[in-house]
Amino acid sequence: KKFRAKQIYEWMHIHHVTSFDEMTNLSKNLRETLKEKADLIVLEEELVQISKIDGTRKYLFALADGNMIESVLMKYKHGNSVCVSSQVGCRMGCRFCASTLDGLERNLTPSEMLRQVYQIQKITGERVSNIVIMGTGEPLDNYDNFLKFIHMVSDEHGLNISQRNIT
């Protein structure tokens, strides 16, 4: 049903819930069905480092499979930017980058990329206005998932971040 789909979408992309139980305008039966048939991506905050120079925050998040990814929040006068990881590890072999040391473990899903932004917004209580895809991994090596992430994060019914504010 279109109405139910809209409700679920809003819970996920506006309220950033991490459990179907939080979707209180859905019937208990529907929430139970959703729990049986779907998973919500949850990132566990393992560590946060805060720069004494400018307040930049680097988050280490654990994925459901135990892999770790990093995301960075940078605060500016014009708004908040989040640096998002696109892969666990990297296969590019750039000598200057530590992400490549253990090679590529796997690509992140669009939902795992999106959840980094949602998680930081939930932690800080502040809106993210810009996204930088310069975390762990090479986004063009995860092209299809990267494009899906861009469409989701720029959707007018969700975060509605302009594609011009995504680099």
Model region roles, listed by residue range:
Residues 1-80:
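Flexible, acidic/Gly-rich N-terminal and inter-domain linker regions that tether
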Residues 67-88, 92-167:
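Conserved Radical SAM active-site core
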